[in-house]
Amino acid sequence: MKNTVFTGAATAVVTPLNKNGVDYEAFERLIEWQISEGIDAIVVAGTTGEGSTLTDEEHRQVLKFAVDKIAGRVPVIAGTGSNDTSYAIDLTKYACSIGADAMLVVTPYYNKATQNGLIKTFTAIADASTKPVILYNVPSRTGCNILPKTCAVLAEHPNIVAIKEASGNISQIAETAALVKGKMDIYSGNDDQIVPILSLGGKGVISVLSNVFPRETSEMCKAFFRGETEKSRDMQLDMLDLINALFCEVNPIPVKAAMAAMGYGENFLRLPLTPMEPEHEANLLAIMRKYGLNV
């Protein structure tokens, strides 16, 4: 039986940036606050962390900074995916060497690999890793979908332990869950589908929402695991307005604005990402205030 990397909520943390580079002071404060709020794991340099627009040097520095500061208090999951498989392998080896607890590896984007190509790619990365590998399926961003039968093949690899499912296709996710049961954990990759995926046997969520509400997002999962399914469902439904506001523009544009309003760095993004439209930002902040946040 493979070990589960985490149960509950893992925050896909933003990477605070400014015109000079990474704002490590704000990043450290964000990490400490997340841990103090009871988050179950932290994902670094993923989609929300703008891993695709960090330089290679920045990417490695951000990973090492997080591993060193977190110091084993919660699992650190390193975003090491790329559409260049050799680079993904190199970054995975580096993340293993500095003590990251697991890797989050997105499907190769733009290249549009076949299912056989995905099997060979993820196998090569997992073979090179000394730590657990979590697959990341987000076809709306990558143009590439990991089909259930492909997950079933990959679930046989001893280092491939889970999948972050952000396809949004509950029927597909249910089919995957049926095929990989006991061999691969499933995490929701969409904040509006946390409870539906938990009901299919999911182990939690890799979340954007938990940047803003780490304790509540974790509790949504834990309530479900305790058998308090109505509480968990109600928390999911109660959060929908905020979730929708956090995704009214492409992630991480809205959450970057939200975290800046909460004092965790500047609302600074790198092209091709641009700051949130003023009317959308005003609506987001109004909704955050409705949820009791002082922004």
Place the predicted regions along the sequence by residue.
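Gly/Ser/Thr-rich beta-alpha loop segments that engage phosphate groups in nucleotides
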Residues: 10, 48-51, 81-83, 145, ...
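Catalytic alpha/beta core domains of metabolic enzymes, predominantly
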Residues: 127-128, 141-247
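Short secondary-structure transition/capping segments
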Residues: 54-57, 89-90, 115-118, 146-148, ...
